[in-house]
Each structure stands twice: as structure tokens, then as C-alpha cells.
Amino acid sequence: MPFEKTMDKIVALAKNRGFVYPGSDIYGGLANTWDYGPIGVELKNNVKKAWWQKFVHESQYNVGIDCAILMNNEVWVASGHVGNFSDPLMDCKECKSRFRADKLVEEHMTSKGVEKASADGWNNEKLKEYIDDNNIVCPDCGKTNFTDIRQFNLMFKTFQGVTEDSKAEIYLRPETAQGIFVNFKNVQRTSRKKIPFGIAQIGKAFRNEITPGNFTFRTREFEQMELEFFCEPGTDLEWHNYWKEYCWKFLLKLGIKEENIRFRVHEKEELSHYSNATSDIEYLFPFGWGELWGIADRTDYDLTQHQNRSGKDMTYLNPVTNERYIPYCIEPSVGADRAVLAFLVDAYDEEELEGGDVRTVMHFHPAIAPFKVAILPLSKKLSEKALDVYNMLRKDFNVDYDDAGSIGKRYRREDEIGTPYCITIDFDTMDNDTVTIRDRDTMKQFRVKIDELKDFIKEKIQF
């Protein structure tokens, strides 16, 4: 019998099993902040490691960087964030609730059956006209008494130094990309990379979102995994397609079901003024389709802006033709937190067993599973041998050890945190140095020699 996969179930499991906790919990929390627990931080780190492996270590084109969160304010003036990084904000005059006007429009479109609803690129007048013409009501109180739409800048301000005046004002970065752009020449010079090449970064970003929500899907503090890939003008659309396919395959290799993802190509009127093409990979969350990964052709906009503002040369000299040009840039950008949420949702399963019992199981790909294996001694008398195996394996893998409760209950605990293989140390182990391995997904069991365990696990975690 099919089960309903809901966000309530995902959130409950995440809290109960140590994936994600509410932020500042003992003080009543802080809205839309979340802390990754012992299991969640392993999952998130594994997702980041997998991304870095495929986008940096296994790519002939790309190198990495780690830029400061705080940057010279001129960076954000040049990039357009100070003047233009805003969302359309409106308030309900009746209940004082605050909303993003574009999201109200998109939710209404979706409710009317529009397949790929989007109000990207709509100005305030067009948004207001749609809201008025369709008599869209406040989601909280049901009234239609809204304020005018105004633009709300999303950057967090703070102060640097001992004085709190306008000269000391500084921003928390709203994206990691600009640190890459301002370091383009440094990286190209020191790495001796030739176009085409990319610069990858994983790091925190901050946006004062008007309506965050849906668990970790939209938060004000989040982590990005971004690649800025620089190419010769005229080859950008070809590279845009290359990275679209690369990102798609990455998700499939790590176990995301193909029926749960789709491409949404931005229409011409949706595109940013500097974009030549943008495509999103959307994931089907329990609350509907949501953007997971954006792949944008940013042309030469960012490097040109920084060249004009800073006065520094951002051109590239082709060593073969001696032609000098500002490279175009393809940006595949994915939120680490959204990616983790997608993997959580995709992995979640409820299986009805013989006898009517239901087991909850997380079908993570072994490469991103928080624990690769769990060591389960059948009896306390076998603890010494079990610890020997545990200590042997944990030098190479993250391994759980559990000797409390019945073996059945221990299996269920490991199923709920997505451990792919449980290794049982039984009395036969003492005689022949073999162990029983239980497969999470099939629940089938088989015996393996202890000295073959490392190779077995290494093979299973490849992707």
C-alpha cells in the first residue's frame, strides 16, 4: 500500500534521529534557523565532499578557492547588489503579515494548473495587476487589503571596527560568486590555467529573505556550492549545455530518482539583463516543485562590472591567437542545504513487512550515507572482537557501533539513519573470522571475511 511522503514526516525523523535540530532550541528557537546534528552534519559533509570530488578533483578544468565572507563594499556596488538585490514586498493591512508578491502570484498560478509557474522578471506594476485581476487573497486571513508593492534589499548589514557609522558599514555576502570574480586574475595567474577553466567554492551566504520556510529549503543563512566556469565568448551556450548535463548526472549518480527532477528553462522575459540563458533543475518536494540547482550563462557581465568599477584589467590573453577578451561565465549554483533536503526526501521510505509491521528506511547512496557500516555484536561477550573490527574500519570510514538492545531494534535504528550495511559479529566469527553483513535495502544477509571488509566497503561507496 503506497504511503504519503510529507514534510511533517521528514522533519520529525530529522529531529528524532539527529539530522537537524531547531536553532537556539532551549531559548524557544529563532525562526527559520536550523542546526545539523551528529547524523545531519555527516550527511551534509558527504554531499559537499561528493560535489567537490566531481566538480574539482575529477574535472580537468576546475580549481578551488575559499573567499572571505566580508568583502569591500565596492564589490557589492559593482555587482549590482547594493542597488538591485531586492525582492518585491507587500503587507496585508488587515493581519500585518508580510509576503513576497512574486511568490503569491506563482502559488496562484500553480493552483490554477500552470505547470511551470514563474513570475521571475516581473516588475511591481505587472505583479500588482495580476494580484488585483485575480483577486488574490492573503494566505493568512483571507482578505484582499494589501499595501503597494515595494522593493526590499536582501543584504544583511553590520559594522566593522569600533564605530557604528556609515563609513563602518559592511555586508554579509549574499552569494559566494563575487569572491570568485574578484579573484579571477589571481587564480588564473597562479594556477596557470588556460580558458576554458572554472573556479569552485563552498561557503556560507546570507540573505534577509522576506518569507523563508519549508524547513531548510529557504533560510536566511545557507551554504552554497558554486562553480564559475570561464569560457571564450561564442562558446558559452555549448558550455551551458555541458554543465546542465553534468549537474543532472551528478544527482542521478547519487541516487536521486529521475522522475523527481526536471529542467525548467527560463523564458526570455524571465532572464536577468546580463544572462544569455538560464536553466533550473527543479526537485519535486512534498510541498511541490522547487529550484534545486541553477545553471546560468552570466556572459561577461560580472568581470566587466568589476573591471569598470575597480579600474583593474580583467581580460584574458589567448596565448595562441594573442586575442584579448573578457571571458564569458557559466555558473552552476546549488545550495548545500537544499541538496541535503532533496536527498533526505528522496531517500525516505516506509515499507510494510510481513506481519503488518512498517519499517522507516533512508535509502541514501552509500557515498553520502552518514555511516557507511554499523558494527553490531550479537552478545556483550563478543564486544572485544567487535571493537577490533570497529577500530580496523574506522581508520578509513565513518563507522557506527551499537551494542544496546535486540538486534532487530538495532537494525531499525540503522535503517532510519540510512546506514547501508550492518556488520554482525556472531559466535561463528570467533571460529572462522567471518561476519554477517545485512543489506539495508534488501534486508538480505551474507557472510564476508573480515580481511575483505575494507575492499567491500570501498567498492560500494564509489559513484
UniProtKB/Swiss-Prot annotation:
What UniProt keywords are attached to this protein's entry?
Aminoacyl-tRNA synthetase, ATP-binding, Cytoplasm, Ligase, Nucleotide-binding, Protein biosynthesis
- Keyword Flavoprotein on entry: no
For biological process, the GO terms are:
glycyl-tRNA aminoacylation
Chief subcellular location equals cytoplasm
Keyword field contains Ligase:
yes
Q: Which reaction does it catalyse?
A: tRNA(Gly) + glycine + ATP = glycyl-tRNA(Gly) + AMP + diphosphate
EC number(s) stated in the UniProt entry for this protein: 6.1.1.14
Tell me which NCBIfam families the record gives.
Answer: glyS_dimeric, PRK04173.1
Similarity comment: Belongs to the class-II aminoacyl-tRNA synthetase family.
Protein's name according to its UniProt entry: Glycine--tRNA ligase
Q: What is the lineage of its organism?
A: Bacteria, Bacillati, Bacillota, Clostridia, Eubacteriales
Q: Which gene encodes it?
A: glyQS
